[in-house]
Amino acid sequence: MQTIDLRGVQPTRTAFERLVPRPVVDVQAAMTVAADLIADVRKRGAAALREQAERFDGGVPASVRVPVAEIVAAVDALPGGVREALEEAIARVREATAAQVPPAAVTRIGPGAVIEQRWQPVERAGLYVPGGKAVYPSSVVMNAVPAQVAGVASIALASPPQREFGGAVHPTILGAAGLLGIDEVYAMGGAGAIGALAWGVGELGLEPVQVITGPGNIYVAAAKRVVRGQTGIDSEAGTTEILVIADDTADPRYVAADLISQAEHDEAAASLLVTDSPAFVGRVAAELETLAASTRYAERVRAALGGQQSAVVLVDDLDAAAAFSNAYGPEHLELQTADAEAVLARIQNAGAIFVGPHAPVSLGDYLAGSNHVLPTGGQARFSPGLGAYSFLRPQQVIRYDREALRAVAGRIVALSGAEDLSAHGEAVTLRFEERA
């Protein structure tokens, strides 16, 4: 990993971003391809989805809409340990997510004047579960549970067909969907799948959804940008990121293992260690060398750790470490310091924060109860991770009686006149006119 020495330096956020550039992910460049694929699905429906499956996934599904019997069979075929782990993950995420649903609030502005704020779930959600270099049944859990907790009545799930399973959705994905009671699953992936969820495909019985969530590759991100406005989206997910703030009290083996755990996702994954201890850097480097050599995806891990997006950052103190992290806005932030709570108090921007030596990112990926669908690419500076709120809309309900309206009628007339919109004021005053 490259080393960046910021001791004695107070760079700006722009300088931070230049020092540790993120992977080059040009979503805009992929939008033309994504838009064309979506347009083809809107025009030709299931035929376009099958052609795209053969072209991009190497397998054509026997049925784009997965028969319910296959989902039931996939649940039955889940290995015992996997099923138990999924059931535990579902329970934990459900419990933690329940706290995200806000109660309705009623405000009495004055006599006879009431404003209620209520939270309404979208009617229908589309969940995208990626394929590619790994299989992600955990993403089924992380997308579906918040939608269910929010009260979404109808859920459709899309996942790419898998060549090794004859064009079918991976059976572990189907099993996870079945455990969650989802019986509307489609063997489709990429930009075409996002378009199908957004506009529907009548011949498949696929009705349009109001929100699409879930991570994917650059074309999925581009497709989300294309369909925004037709439907809501959660975010444009990029490659995974981990930033570890550690001092010399941390266990270098733990830190190295956590950096590697995210590097194994993709050659473009970002792994950063920010520390005030040069001696600790050497200990972590030795552990990285040992652990990376023994991992299943050693070549991928080495490529990620050696990429421009990964680095060891030396800083003067932990205040400077927190400042760097806030400027970077990591997807995953680990705090492994003698007083992690003190560092936490200085953190503003992160998708999720893992405090202490026994809260690795891997815990959050599967069984912490938190959600692992998190903002990447610096979006943690302004966007949250996935939650029940991703499927909820606040609505204001206004109730005024006659006297409450009369009390503000004059001011409404004054303001509407100032805006040269006299009919606004007249819509109020006519309510108090005598009618013959």
From Swiss-Prot:
GO CC field: cytosol
Q: Where does substrate bind?
A: T240, Q262, H265, H332, D365, E419, H424
Cofactor(s) this protein requires: Zn(2+)
**Record family assignment:** Belongs to the histidinol dehydrogenase family.
Which InterPro entries is this protein grouped with?
Ald_DH/histidinol_DH, Histidinol_DH_CS, Histidinol_DH_monofunct, Hstdl_DH
Tell me one Pfam family matched here: Histidinol_dh
Q: Name one GO molecular function term.
A: zinc ion binding
User: One biological-process term from Gene Ontology?
Assistant: L-histidine biosynthetic process
EC numbers, comma separated? 1.1.1.23
Q: Which keywords belong to this entry?
A: Amino-acid biosynthesis, Histidine biosynthesis, Metal-binding, NAD, Oxidoreductase, Zinc
Q: Which residues form the active site?
A: E331 (proton acceptor), H332 (proton acceptor)
Q: Where does Zn(2+) bind?
A: Q262, H265, D365, H424
The pathway to which it is assigned is: Amino-acid biosynthesis; L-histidine biosynthesis; L-histidine from 5-phospho-alpha-D-ribose 1-diphosphate: step 9/9
Question: What does the entry's cofactor note say about binding and number?
Answer: Binds 1 zinc ion per subunit.
Q: What does this protein do?
A: Catalyzes the sequential NAD-dependent oxidations of L-histidinol to L-histidinaldehyde and then to L-histidine.
Organism of origin is Leifsonia xyli subsp. xyli (strain CTCB07)
Coiled-coil segments on the chain, per record? none
Listed name of the protein:
Histidinol dehydrogenase
Q: Which domain of life is it from?
A: Bacteria
Catalysed reaction equations from the record = L-histidinol + 2 NAD(+) + H2O = L-histidine + 2 NADH + 3 H(+)
